[in-house]
Design a protein with these regions (language model features):
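Short, flexible loop segments at the rims of nucleotide/cofactor-binding pockets, characterized by
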Residues: 1, 70-75, 106-108
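Residue-level preference for the first positions of well-ordered beta-strands
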Residues: 16-18, 93-97
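Catalytic core of membrane glycerolipid acyltransferases/transacylases, capturing the structured
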Residues: 13-74
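A cross-family acyltransferase "interaction/gating" segment
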Residues: 11, 58, 93, 107-171
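Short glycine-/polar-rich loops that comprise or flank the Walker A/P-loop
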Residues: 42-43, 65, 90, 124-128
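Helix-adjacent hinge/juxtasegments
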Residues: 68-82, 88-89
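A short, well-structured juxtamembrane/interface segment
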Residues: 1-16
Length: 172
């Protein structure tokens, strides 16, 4: 598929930041990774469902690329945020789908997000940028695994302005 970036100039060339993106299909991480790695030469670290790390080949790739497994229940819930915190302190990019799963809305409206991305930004002082993406649902159905005809359709990835957290940073 063809990624069409809009607003990429808003992202810092150096230093850590957090990207928060909507999550429509299983192609979304590839679109964001393309945007940051190919366009900016920065490899993002995604927080990803732990089950993906158990899939042969895919799990090995995720681990080798420094992606962060998220355990959805149990005592290890703070482990992903600690790992993300360490990457941010080292100047890396973290990408998070704050909904924690694929959007369930048939109209693809975002669901309520979790607070981890903002907590990371407040704890580390790094900027947060919203990412809106659309078009991947024309290539891969929302919960599907079979590509639709026209694989080379565009996937639009829009980078928004930095989220202003100054009022919240003052409270800390």
């Amino acid at each position: 598929f063809k990624v069409v970036p809009v607003g990429i100039e808003k992202l810092p060339k150096k230093g850590a930041y957090v990207l928060v993106a909507n999550h429509v299909t299983n192609l979304d991480a590839l679109a964001v990774a393309y945007l940051t790695y190919v366009q900016l030469k920065r490899a993002p670290h995604f927080l990803a469902k732990e089950g993906l790390f158990r899939v042969p080949v895919i799990g090995a790739i995720l681990r080798a690329a420094g992606q962060i497994p998220v355990y959805r229940s149990g005592h290890r819930n703070d482990t992903p945020l600690k790992a993300a915190h360490a990457y941010l302190e080292a100047g890396h990019t973290i990408a998070i789908f704050p909904e924690g799963t694929l959007t369930r809305s048939p109209e693809l409206w975002p669901m309520r997000g979790k607070s981890g991305a903002i907590r990371l930004a407040l704890e580390t002082g790094v900027p947060v940028y919203p990412v809106g993406q659309w078009g991947s649902e024309q290539i891969l159905p929302q919960y599907g695994s079979k590509f639709r005809p026209g694989f080379w359709k565009p996937v639009n990835v829009l980078i928004g302005d930095e989220i202003d957290l100054s009022n919240y940073r003052k409270r800390q």
